[in-house]
Amino acid sequence: MGRKSRLKRERRELKLHGVSDNSSRALVLLDEHSQSVYRFFQEEWQADALARGDVWLSTLETCRAYENPEQGDAEEAHETYNSGHAVGGSGDPELVEVARRSGIHIGPGCSNITISNNTRKSVLPDAYVLCTTTDFSPEKLGETFGRYCVEITNPRQFFIAVSEVLEGIVSIREAAAGKVIYKDRFYTGMEQPPGPIGFVKPPDPYTNQKEFRFLWIPKEANELNPFLLKCPEVGHLCERIA
């Protein structure tokens, strides 16, 4: 199934769950993961809060600032593209694509164009984020993220419900939920992009975390601060298990 067809199907399903038309256009489910995900906490009260439906939303900027290298990632939601060396004209689709990826527009009737070693860095300035894992492994994650844990039994319904409540407070441009892809965030030439920005992290040291991420990008993303979102609608989806 192509990306456009998949997105149309997802939006139809989101509407069936009671999501408004405007909201469903902004929500993207990146994969078909339907099993539980888990959120670990350092403090017991934090776990109890989520089990009641009080959802602590962090921000990308907060995640970038953590000193612990297994928690913090200064390059969170960054992506770097390098053109390599390409020669051609307007009729060469690969050159046109390399130019587009480099931030260069090639109009009709152009020839003898050379693009060499052009680097473009894309950054998602900030967004609200909730990081969970698909792997309940206290022995691996407890020391870094805490020994208290809440199971979110239906991440799809959780994402939809939290998005609806958040939309009532903040105007959301786009939101996505899915597994993090563990790959280099650099690509070149005609290589496939590593994945959706905000959902790609380097394998070392993160791959063992098996992260499942919820991400909400506000239309106005300046000076975002973490906050507690009261969302009793998800209380029945959140169970304290440790």
Residue locations for each model-derived region?
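NAD-dependent ADP-ribosyltransferases
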Residues: K4-A242
